[in-house]
Amino acid sequence: MSRKYFGTDGIRGRANGLITPELAMKVGQAAGLVFQRGEYRHRVVIGKDTRLSGYMIETALVAGFTSVGMDVLLLGPMPTPAVAMLTKSMRADLGVMISASHNLFEDNGIKLFGPLGFKLSDEVERQIEQLLDECLDKRLAASASLGRARRIDGVHDRYIEFAKRTLPRDLSLDGLRVVIDCANGAAYKVVPEALWELGADVISIGVEPDGFNINKECGSTAPEALSRKVREMRADIGIALDGDADRVILVDERGHVVDGDQLLAVIAQSWQEDGRLSKPGIVATVMSNLGLERFLEGHGIEMVRTPVGDRYVLEQMMTGGYNLGGEPSGHIILSDYATTGDGFVAALQVLAVVQKLGRPVSEVCHKFDPLPQILKNVRFRAGKPLDDADVKSAIRDGEQRLNGHGRLLIRPSGTEPVIRVMAEGDDRDVVEEVVDSICSALGEAAAAAA
């Protein structure tokens, strides 16, 4: 069965477009019915980021879950990885994060976690989707069996203690000046406080959410403001989270951006030296730079690639027995600690290496020179541009030109009507020509189908 609602990271779309109160309530009902197993009171924890539409969606989800007899524990603004962690620690049957991650405020989404804090499998999502298009009136709870909802206090402290426990007890961030950019999102309270408790000299930006400014010219997708602040304050490092704090990008003391591939290299090498890698390998996606793969090979570390999406990274980690994986966008999964990407915990692992080595971040976090890589998006309204004959011809030509000297990747986005074209190789001019040729053919095919 094709997926009508769920994309690569839950259900996501424009608030009051795809993501309406009606849909959110139905998601609550459907997910509640799927996860009611056994004759006991069932509970769901719900967190959110700082988007204006979060109130609307939260209220609708509460109506849906309580109408099928599930109790609801409301966490308020919390990072996605905190919701996953609290789902497990609070013995909930289900966890929900209301967020569109790195998107701007106009969008929102619903991410679901199972009782152990993992994102749902494709099969469970299909079960929920099937119920979304059914009339559930006859499956609602009796009046005396309706669920209750209440807000939970103290959850920030629980996440802070969890994050601090991922570092050795004798490791302090004393003497480290850190600029943290919380993207005006879910981590705006909890992460600066955690850094302060660890001893860092903390300078915070992106911590004044107003419902509209989440990810706006800030956070991991726009690290320019962080870069300027790091240089201005003569800081040692900058940390940029996205709106729900499941991804992270760093900035060194010179203001240079450190992406997820470099972070994977830093952590992988450190963990290998300390004997902490569960096996001599990590998991990355097809988007990770070939330079990372070559660096890891040079240190005896295998890199296994998956499709784009942290859920696929985690699946491969679990089936293959790996404890480190991630994406260049900054989704870093450390399965010794978390069941999903955790931007803050990943940043802490890098800070630990910096403190251990006593060297500048620019030296610690520049492990390899990335191969020239170009990524372009082609938007389309209708049709299937990838089936066009001219597009197929351009792709074949590109593969031949890069053969043995690079990679070519073309894939539709899982969250929007966009085709992503990525190429990388030793010769930048060739890479540019290949990408431009394919994008031109895709653009013409998309225009013809519109």
Curated annotation (Swiss-Prot):
Residues modified as Phosphoserine: 101
Cofactor detail note: Binds 1 Mg(2+) ion per subunit.
InterPro entries: A-D-PHexomutase_a/b/a-I, A-D-PHexomutase_a/b/a-I/II/III, A-D-PHexomutase_a/b/a-II, A-D-PHexomutase_a/b/a-III, A-D-PHexomutase_C, A-D-PHexomutase_C_sf, Alpha-D-phosphohexomutase_SF, GlmM_bact
Catalytic activity reported: alpha-D-glucosamine 1-phosphate = D-glucosamine 6-phosphate
Protein keywords: Isomerase, Magnesium, Metal-binding, Phosphoprotein
EC class name: isomerase
GO biological process: carbohydrate metabolic process; peptidoglycan biosynthetic process; UDP-N-acetylglucosamine biosynthetic process
Domain of life, source organism: Bacteria
Active site: 101 (phosphoserine intermediate)
Single GO term (MF): phosphomannomutase activity
Residues at which Mg(2+) binds: 101, 242, 244, 246
Modification(s) after translation: Activated by phosphorylation.
Cofactors demanded by this protein: Mg(2+)
GO annotation, cellular component aspect: cytosol
Enzyme Commission code(s) on record: 5.4.2.10
Keyword Signal on entry: no
Family label: Belongs to the phosphohexose mutase family.
HAMAP family assigned: GlmM_B
Function: Catalyzes the conversion of glucosamine-6-phosphate to glucosamine-1-phosphate.
Matches recorded under NCBIfam families: glmM, PRK10887.1
The protein's name in its UniProt record: Phosphoglucosamine mutase
Organism expressing this protein natively: Rhodopseudomonas palustris (strain BisA53)
